[in-house]
Amino acid sequence: MTKYAQTEALVVGGTGAIGLAIAKRLVEGGATVLLTAGTAEDRAHAAAELGSSARVLDPTGFEDALAARDGDGVDLLFAGSVPVARPLLGHLRDGGALVLTSPTPCPGTVRALAAELAGRGIRVNAVAPGCIEAPGSGAAPLPPLGRLGAAEEVARAALFLATEATFTTGARLPVDGGLGTP
């Protein structure tokens, strides 16, 4: 499958369930992926899961790795929060997309950053995951849909916002099984 061929993406904190699911879908679609992982064990696990289409980096040195690469940046940036993403915006190509993936992205912050980057043609959106199955996540109340979500479901929503929702910016998409429904 080459849905994301010629696409370069950076997934910050990519060894959590959601980040790894995003990276896997990107790699399966033909993208070149840079991924950060905090520990040597996490880096080894991610490298084994993703194969040679992904480069797994230590968070302390990945900005140097980005600067040393051929090319002028990445097309897609996935990060948990604005403070994590902001220092990396210089590595995001004009016309690219930033998707925030933390459970509680503030809608006003997403809209403000979207307005700030609109002049570069960069779209900024967020997914807001609810109760997601993950190792060690413990018991959680079930949402109205009656089950916990899967990291893969959040990854699909994030990739939709990054690649297919080309006229959408400043949006926050709940992926919570109805928990946020009034």
Question: Where do the protein language model's features map onto the residues?
Answer:
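Conserved glycine-rich Rossmann-like NAD(P)H-binding loop of the short-chain dehydrogenase/reductase
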Residues: 31-45
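Conserved SDR Rossmann-fold cofactor-binding beta-strand/turn motif
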Residues: 123-133, 162, 174-176
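Alpha-helical segment proximal to the catalytic Tyr-Lys
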Residues: 90, 115-116
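Conserved glycine-rich cofactor-binding loop
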Residues: 8, 15-16
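Rossmann-fold cofactor-recognition segment
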Residues: 48-62
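C-terminal substrate-recognition "lid" of short-chain dehydrogenase/reductases
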Residues: 72, 147-175, 180
